[in-house]
Swiss-Prot record:
<dbReference type="Pfam" id="PF00789">
    <property type="entry name" value="UBX"/>
</dbReference>
<feature type="domain" description="SEP">
    <location>
        <begin position="175"/>
        <end position="240"/>
    </location>
</feature>
<protein>
    <recommendedName>
        <fullName>UBX domain-containing protein 2B</fullName>
    </recommendedName>
</protein>
<dbReference type="GO" id="GO:0005794">
    <property type="term" value="C:Golgi apparatus"/>
</dbReference>
<dbReference type="GO" id="GO:0043161">
    <property type="term" value="P:proteasome-mediated ubiquitin-dependent protein catabolic process"/>
</dbReference>
<keyword id="KW-0256">Endoplasmic reticulum</keyword>
<dbReference type="GO" id="GO:0005813">
    <property type="term" value="C:centrosome"/>
</dbReference>
<dbReference type="GO" id="GO:0005634">
    <property type="term" value="C:nucleus"/>
</dbReference>
<dbReference type="GO" id="GO:0061025">
    <property type="term" value="P:membrane fusion"/>
</dbReference>
<comment type="similarity">
    <text>Belongs to the NSFL1C family.</text>
</comment>
<dbReference type="InterPro" id="IPR029071">
    <property type="entry name" value="Ubiquitin-like_domsf"/>
</dbReference>
<feature type="compositionally biased region" description="Basic and acidic residues">
    <location>
        <begin position="73"/>
        <end position="95"/>
    </location>
</feature>
<dbReference type="GO" id="GO:0043130">
    <property type="term" value="F:ubiquitin binding"/>
</dbReference>
<dbReference type="Pfam" id="PF08059">
    <property type="entry name" value="SEP"/>
</dbReference>
<dbReference type="InterPro" id="IPR036241">
    <property type="entry name" value="NSFL1C_SEP_dom_sf"/>
</dbReference>
<dbReference type="GO" id="GO:0007030">
    <property type="term" value="P:Golgi organization"/>
</dbReference>
<comment type="function">
    <text>Adapter protein required for Golgi and endoplasmic reticulum biogenesis. Involved in Golgi and endoplasmic reticulum maintenance during interphase and in their reassembly at the end of mitosis. Regulates the centrosomal levels of kinase AURKA/Aurora A during mitotic progression by promoting AURKA removal from centrosomes in prophase. Also, regulates spindle orientation during mitosis.</text>
</comment>
Amino acid sequence: MADGGASPAQQEGEMSAAGPGLRRERQHRGSGRPPSARDLQLALAELYEDEAKRQSLRSDKPTTTKMSNSKGLKIDSFRSLRKPERSMSDDKENQRFYSGDSEYRGLQIWGASNNPSKIVAELFKEAKEHGAVPLDEASRTSGDFSKAKSFSGGGYRLGDSSQKHSEYIYGENQDVQILLKLWRNGFSLDDGELRSYSDPINAQFLESVKRGEIPVDLQRLVHGGQVNLDMEDHQEQEYVKPRLRFKAFSGEGQKLGSLTPEIVSTPSSPEEEDKSILNAPVLIDDSVPATKIQIRLADGSRLIQRFNQTHRIKDIRDFIIQSRPAFATTDFVLVTTFPNKELTDESLTLREADILNTVILQQLK
């Protein structure tokens, strides 16, 4: 057309490119009547729909943006471990940290846990990964595990003549056997004191055990040998301090310095002494010095009785028969312990026989 207007075909192409909303508007314009409110709403709705379709087409194209919280990503640095969706309770329960100087090298560090069972479980798990085996398996593979080991330490080689002196022979390096007991409230070594899981020094000790290394605390015990560490799981129990196995000497001794040493015996309980006295009453003269005689009978029992030093050996025999009537028809003798001497002359007093405060043995003939 002369006025430069577009042809009908060109107008149709523009309408298809602009969308149905524009076509609807031009149709109303060509009809000669103004568009109604409904027509405007339909045109706007179709316009928004077209915009949404274009946005969806753009989102389908690949991008180089990484998802920050994708579960499939590999932890490469300390920063990627900070997960905002992790609750505070999880952090308090068991913390893990990653420390590294590059994307391909680093060290994972376990923080202190408030759950002892998890500490024990992780300790057994990682120790097993470093070569530790359960005790039943170790006992099956090692036939000498339960056998007692003979002494193999150092000792003295005695001289074979008066000119040659004794010399000390050093033994081979000995292995150190240590038992690590894991309790609910801590751990202990052998029968030692309780050590808390929360102590940083103790945590470092357990970390060394996890890695299969000798802890610093145990390195001083190793002199060229190795440490055999056994672990026992007692996480269901609270630590109880073990009783001391040391027992003081409670036997008898001999006072040296005379031909017939005086026996220094341990004090007996009052009940034991009273029982011996009640078995056979012995008349005691308080104006005369007294002594106490311990009698070891042939049946393994013993009697303890006070006598005057003027009592005779025959009085001891009578006391035995009165206390144990079964020996009345038995032939026996009385013998000293050191030196071993039979008391044949029973008419001697206890002082004359030099058996004050001693032990007398009954021997059957």
